[in-house]
Amino acid sequence: MIERCLGAYRCRRIQRALRQLKVTILCLLLTVVVLRSTIGAGKFGTPEQDLDEIRQHFHARKRGEPHRVLEEIQTGGDSSSGDGGGNSGGSNNYETFDINKIFVDEGEEEKPDPNKPYTLGPKISDWDEQRSDWLAKNPSFPNFIGPNKPRVLLVTGSAPKPCENPVGDHYLLKSIKNKIDYCRLHGIEIFYNMALLDAEMAGFWAKLPLIRKLLLSHPEIEFLWWMDSDAMFTDMAFELPWERYKDYNLVMHGWNEMVYDQKNWIGLNTGSFLLRNNQWALDLLDTWAPMGPKGKIREEAGKVLTRELKDRPVFEADDQSAMVYLLATQRDAWGNKVYLESGYYLHGYWGILVDRYEEMIENYHPGLGDHRWPLVTHFVGCKPCGKFGDYPVERCLKQMDRAFNFGDNQILQIYGFTHKSLASRKVKRVRNETSNPLEMKDELGLLHPAFKAVKVQTNQV
């Protein structure tokens, strides 16, 4: 019937099309079955869900292919043995990386001749003349940068390698930030050292070769201010009474009675002191240094210091005990140029200060520098960069945070902020913003302090 109506030719074409349609449908069904079995579609879902899963599968695969290529490249890079390229291999995890792998000590240290006495360098006897000539020839670098305002270089530093505990370097960063803030406010230059200039003078004594080198390299400096890395400024407004020291070459926190009469090894502190740049200072360094070389010399000197100084424990010679011994036994040679400062805290022992910060805030104000508001809080014995300290780690770190925030609040108040508490890293706003910011009053006078250096072109030698 169909053939009569459509004709034989058309009928054969329709039959051929139907057969092709059957084959197409069969192929489609087979494709769906294969996809459902290989990519996980069809888990009791509807055809619509199957279609969504198929789309997601191909989309995820398309996104994953570039990552797979990168992973293959990184894997290939890990197996390479390049010397310094960006893909030289190794883990991306800083926490698990052994930092000691990148430290290379090139060659052995040069050993000194044991038959020769130790010296910091060639003997210099005319430094005052050399320095005076230099200052006269370089008037743009005066040693006094304001009336009774000497040019001062604050020097501090730390070891060339990272600290021996996970948080030590963080506290070193806080300490140097604190010192930078004080120096910026008071017109003081700063030098941070991380190099051991003389292997023989490691530990307590490392400061001596550095101090001598800086004095000779910077004749424009009138005073060098050494400060240990574990000491922090806690009175940002206190300006040192420079006029008081016009006739002195060395200023240390201490007491005459404890040093000269009692010979007490803690009668002064060498963690924060001022040294004038002159011939007297070079002579003092030359006299101070011979107890410092590590090994037998330092050990034997330690025995002498323990025997001669009051209450000193038995340990190798340290720079502080050596200074007490030097002043007590050679007072006529050095004492008349040494000022032992007890009027304010050029060094303030942290154990008697940190628990009183809130009381200070309530009753006193910055700018006093003494027990009411200490200029410096020194964390003697905490050793935040070492493996072990002399005090509980938790107490040391908590109090170092409090001391930092105590000083930092004086900086933040300039800009209208303060720490939420002395124990908090977070800050809060303490005054509202204004469209006339220059009319805001700086309560502590630290934004443009009167004591900040004003450069003049006159030399005072």
UniProtKB/Swiss-Prot annotation:
Residue numbers on the Cytoplasmic membrane side: 1-20
Pfam families on file: Glyco_transf_34
Membrane topology recorded in Swiss-Prot or TrEMBL: Single-pass type II membrane protein
Entry's Gene Ontology BP terms: polysaccharide biosynthetic process; xyloglucan metabolic process
Sorted UniProt keywords: Glycoprotein, Glycosyltransferase, Golgi apparatus, Membrane, Signal-anchor, Transferase, Transmembrane, Transmembrane helix
Cellular compartments annotated: Golgi apparatus membrane
InterPro entries (UniProt xref): Glyco_trans_34, Nucleotide-diphossugar_trans
Glycan attachment residues as annotated in the record: 432
GO cellular component terms attached to this protein's record: cytosol; endosome; Golgi apparatus; Golgi membrane; Golgi trans cisterna; trans-Golgi network
EC number(s) reported in the record: 2.4.2.39, 2.4.-.-
Function per UniProt: Xylosyltransferase specific to UDP-D-xylose that accepts both cellopentaose and cellohexaose as substrates, with a better use of cellohexaose, to produce xyloglucan. Adds preferentially the first xylosyl residue to the fourth glucosyl residue from the reducing end of both acceptors. Transfer one xylose mainly to the second glucose residue from the non-reducing end. The acceptor should have a minimum of four glucose residues. Associates with other xyloglucan-synthesizing enzymes to form multiprotein complexes for xyloglucan synthesis in the Golgi.
Protein name as it appears in the record: Xyloglucan 6-xylosyltransferase 2
Organism: Arabidopsis thaliana
Upper lineage: Eukaryota, Viridiplantae, Streptophyta, Embryophyta, Tracheophyta
